[in-house]
Every structure is written in C-alpha cells, then in structure tokens.
Amino acid sequence: MPAPKPPAFETLSLHAGQHPDPVTRSRAVPIYQTTSYLFDDADHAAGLFNLERAGHIYTRISNPTTAVLEERLAALEDGVGAVCTASGMAAMHLAIATLLSAGDHIVASASLYGGTINLLTHTLPRFGITTTFVKPRDLDGFRAAIGPKTRLVVGETLGNPGLEVLDIPRVAEIAHAAAVPLLVDNTFATPYLSRPLTLGADIVMHSITKWIGGHGIAIGGALIDGGRFDWRASGKFPTLSEPYAGYHGIVFAEEFGPASFIMRARAEGLRDFGACLSPTNAFHLLQGVETLALRMERHMHNTKAVLDFLRKNAAVDWVLHPSLETHPDHERAKSLLPNGAGAIVSFGVKGGRAAGRKFIEAVRLSSHLANVGDAKTLVIHPASTTHQQMDAAALAAAGVGEELIRVSVGLEAAGDIIDDLAQALRASQKA
C-alpha cells in the first residue's frame, strides 16, 4: 500500500500540531492561560525536570497553546522543532546565546533588520561576541570573513532595505565547508514564499509579528531547527556536544540528536532568559497562521498591481522589488522565490526629502507607521522619521535615500491602495 501523501501547505497551516482537547472536544485551539501544571507524583515531576519525559512544568518554558504554534511553524518550515519567543529580536538573541560564547565570532549579511544590526554591532561585543558584516551578494566576502572563531553565519531571505535575495544554497555551502551553521531570518518571505531549511539553511528565525501573524495585534518570534547540522562532528559547539551542568551533565547532542539545538534553546534559553511568548499572543498568532497562504496570495497580487502603477507614475524616480527585471537579483528571485518576492516595495519620489514628507502626510488609506507585514497597507518615509537625524550623505551611506518611500502592501482592494498612493504622489509634487 503506498504511503499517504503529505498534507499540503494550506492544510498544515490549519491542522499541524493540534490534537483536539479530549475532554472539552474544542475544535479551536484553546488558550491555556496558566502559569504552571500539576504533577502526577514525585517521579513524574522528576522526569520532567530531568528532561526524561515530555510535558509542561511552567509556561516560561512551554505551554500547550504555544506548543501548537511551535509545531505548526516547524511543519511549515520543514523543521524538526521550534521555540516561540516574546519577539523576533528575542528569537535572534536566543539562537546566538544557545550556540556562542565570549570570544566567538559571527559573519553576517550587511543587509539585516536594524534591530539585528544593533544587536550584533553594539550589544553583543559587550559580551565578547564580534561580527563581520559582508554585502549579501559577495559570496567570496562570506568565505573570506569566516575565521577559526566563527560559529554562525546570518542572513535574511530578503534583505533590508535593499530587498537583496540571499543565495541561500551557496551561502550554506560556504558555511558548511567551515563546519558552521547558517541562520536565515525568513520574516519578509514567510514559509509560503521560501523555506530556507530546504535550501540548505540550518536554523530559521521569524518575527511572527509580521506576515505570519499578519494583523498587527500581537508581537512574537520563533526559531525553527532544521535538524540537519551535525553539532558533534563540527567540534565547535560545546553547548551541544559536551555535558551541561545546568541539567545534571546532559549532553544535548546525545540525548536529542537532530533536535539538540532547539531543545537547548528551550531548556536553557527560555528558562534562564525568560523571553517567552504569552499563550494569549500565541493564540492570536495562530489565527494568522491559519490564513497565511490565502493572505500571501493576496499580498502578492496587490504588490504586482502597486508595482505596475508606480513604474508608470511621473512622480516616481525609481522602484525597487526583486520581481522587477531591473532588480539585480531578479533571476535569483525567480528561482528561489517562485511564489512571489514579498510585499515590501521601495520607491523614490521626485523632489527628495521635502517631497517624501509631503507624500507621507497626504496618505489617507495607508497607515503611516514603522511596522511591516500588516493586513493594512503601511507606509513610511525614513528620511523624515526613523532616520531624520541624518543628513543626505549619512543617509546615502546607510542605503536610505532622502527620496525613499517604503510600502508594506496590504490586503485592501488593489484599486483603493493605488488611488491613495496616486493622490499622495500628486500632493508630493505641489509647491
């Protein structure tokens, strides 16, 4: 008898990780709003604390509602396990703290989320961890930057702010040749557009606040373990390959095999750092996961319509998106992102900083704020907001022109989005 066909992405989005409550028979995932869980007896408690059996002890470490979200994300990303955190930045910090120690080194793409850049540039050096940044298209640069103390390579599926498409298979090859794992932030793509673990990455990170949650109502992060990196053979990761006194001398690579990284991240990281996701936020984010495929299809449809409009508008100097033939990574996007290259569009408004400010102040339907990945269309002009303290030269050095407008394309009717952008562009050109 042939093996059953694995469920499709849309089906996993709705069903993975959940077994309906046998007592209440609730079809929806319940919110287990509790801090702690009853033990059957002393032996049961001891087994849980020694990591000898599955179960819940305290919601800082695990929770039944959050566990459904974790298992579902692991299924969507083709991983062996996941840990959810209070935010995307908590997930990034947790990954690094699980693998690296003082004296270790990271090689990272220079096109990363600003919070990640700040963590790597300013915060981690205080703890003895340094980073070398490399342009995301510079494969030789990645190779040259890896040294004897390098323990992690970091990149984003779609870079920020240039929307560079990371060549995940080739960067993974470079990292693995040095016995180092590749961590990819897949926030901008979501597993609907890209599954980095299937392309060679070892760990995937998300700010699930963004498109996965999709509605701007809950903050959360996630780490997904691909389970394919051999931590013991590498010889560079004592946190996984050597006895850990914090859990009675357990060797995570021996006890948990392919899931050793994600188990250490949970057992030590959530226990000691405490950046756990609340069960209520896990519930809210699960609602987003259930409609992820449908929403991403609409995001891609609307993004194409917005791009077609912007390219023809006389008030626009340039448009940036990997789906456009003018983008340097267009061919790579077609290969690695066949379902679409994300819902972030950048463009330059004629008239520079002053015109950009007029545009932002003229939008009516679009929301002027600093988030991305909402169901609603969001816009921002960095030169008059997030980067307003910089002059033209400093902005250029940061890759943020005075004329740059960033649009996170939402789910409204495409015609309504375009009408709003059109009237704001007209306003931007008035004296």
Predicted regions located by residue number:
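Conserved PLP-enzyme active-site core in the AAT-like
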Residues: 2-3, 13-15, 19-22, 82-312
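Glycine-centered tight turns that cap/initiate beta-strands
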Residues: 78, 149, 315-318, 365, ...
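Conserved N-terminal alpha-helix of the aminotransferase class I/II PLP-enzyme fold
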Residues: 41-93, 115-123
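Short hydrophobic/aromatic beta-strand micro-patches
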Residues: 224, 346-348, 408-410
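Short loop segments at secondary-structure junctions
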Residues: 36, 226-229, 349-352
